[in-house]
Regions:
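Active-site glycine/GP-rich loop and adjacent strand/helix microenvironment
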Residues: 1-194
Length: 194
């Protein structure tokens, strides 16, 4: 991996934070990704964790992109939409059609039109991530699919894995289907995973 000094960093780019001794004798990866918001003085925000990403097809989707796309879609709705919890996983081998990203969302107040809402999120994702855009336009992936999780579905999921509590959080994105396969049993009846 390429190492950057503070003088080389650019604003708005994700970097992995490495702690080092002044002489560089050892380095430690703390697992966070950061973005610089200012260079004079240097200011950063934590933009995610390096283990939380989706890249099943080379798209390199990170948590901050997913959260921002979802926030944009919610803000663009004419009616109030509130989301209790969500996670995203790749669907690599669907029964029919191209693979896609599968969004499991538990709504307190769902959107009026779930398909339109999904298209808004997908368009925001394409605008945020050029690799995702290339895979959609190149017909390697189809646009994302939303699965509505029943009320308390995520809470029940966390309880079944023994991690219910304030310090435990559902990962926003995962590069595998471990969480998704369990959440399928907590879907609203109108969902039909394919």
């Amino acid at each position: 991996p390429q190492i950057h000094t503070l003088e080389e960093v650019e604003l708005g780019i994700n970097y992995v934070l490495i702690i080092s001794t002044t002489a560089g004798l050892w380095r430690y990866n703390i697992g966070d990704t950061i973005q610089f918001t200012s260079r004079f003085p240097f200011k950063v925000i934590v933009s995610g964790r390096i283990k939380h990403f989706i890249s099943a097809f080379g798209e390199h989707v990170i948590v901050s992109e997913v959260e921002q796309a979802l926030q944009q879609a919610v803000a663009s709705e004419r009616t109030e939409v509130t989301i209790r919890e969500f996670t995203v996983a790749p669907q690599v081998k669907p029964n029919t059609g191209l693979p896609y990203h599968e969004w499991f969302i538990e709504f307190d107040q769902p959107p009026a039109d779930l398909n339109t809402f999904a298209l808004k999120i997908d368009q925001a994702m394409q605008n945020k991530n050029i690799y995702y855009n290339d895979l959609i336009t190149g017909k390697v992936l189809r646009p994302l699919v939303i699965r509505m999780v029943a009320k308390d579905g995520f809470k029940n999921y966390m309880k079944t894995i023994g991690k219910l509590g304030g310090q435990n959080k559902v990962p926003r994105v995962s590069d595998n289907r471990k969480i998704a396969e369990v959440l399928i049993s907590y879907l609203e009846p109108l969902n039909d995973p394919k």
